[in-house]
Every structure is written in structure tokens, then in C-alpha cells.
Amino acid sequence: MIHFNVPPFVGTEFKYMHEAVENHKICGDGPFTKKCDEWLENRFKAERVMLTTSGSTALDMAALLCGIKPGDEVILPSFTFSSTANSFVLAGATLVFVDIRPDTMNIDETKIEAAITEKTKVICPVHY
């Protein structure tokens, strides 16, 4: 089997998952979320950080915050999760797919500029 993504394990995962479940804090409003928020705010000197429960939710929020409306174009890689496209389509955008680099599976940065038009509102790279 070829694994698409292998998350790292450091040995404390079950302890922390048990603590979150035991305290009924599994939906993003618990102490672990607060610790992550604070760490990210400090690390990136951000005024405010907001973790989401999924990448799909984060992309939905991004489409809203970018003010995507019908007629706007969004550039994204030709190889990505369906939620990348769905979030912007649901906001009314026209998708512009750009080929990926076979060595990284990420959007081919040398092809982005040719895809930009006066209607381009967002470039949404996805990293693997």
C-alpha cells in the first residue's frame, strides 16, 4: 500500500485524546485549542488565530473572508482535495486549474502567472 499521508506519532497522542474526550472538549473550545492558538499567535506575531475543525471549514472561511463572488476566478492546483474546489465554487467562483509539479505534487509555480487574469481574486496553493 502506498500511503497518501502518514502523520507523525510522538507517544502522547492517546493521553491527550483521552483528556479531551474525558473533559468533553473535542470540538475546538478546549485547553489544547487555546494552547495552539497562543503558540501560533506568538510564533507568527499574529493579532488573532482561529483554529478550525477541518481544512474544509478553513477553506469555506477563506472564501468568505476573501469576498469571493460570482465571476471571480480562483487559481488552484489540478491535484487537490475536492474541498479546495468546493469551497470556492459554493461562493460562486470560476475555478482555474494549474498543473502540478510531479516532483512535489504541488502547484507548478512557473505556470501560475500565465493563469492570472483581471478576474483572478485568489491563488489557493495546496501543500503536500
Predicted regions and their residues:
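Short alpha-helix boundary/capping motifs
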Residues: 10, 30-31, 52, 78, ...
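PLP-dependent aminotransferase-like
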Residues: 64-128
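Short beta-strand segments
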Residues: 3-5, 52-53, 124-126
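A generic local structural motif
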Residues: 3-5, 13-14, 36-37, 60-63, ...
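Alpha-helix N-cap/helix-start and coil->helix boundary motif
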Residues: 11, 56, 81-82
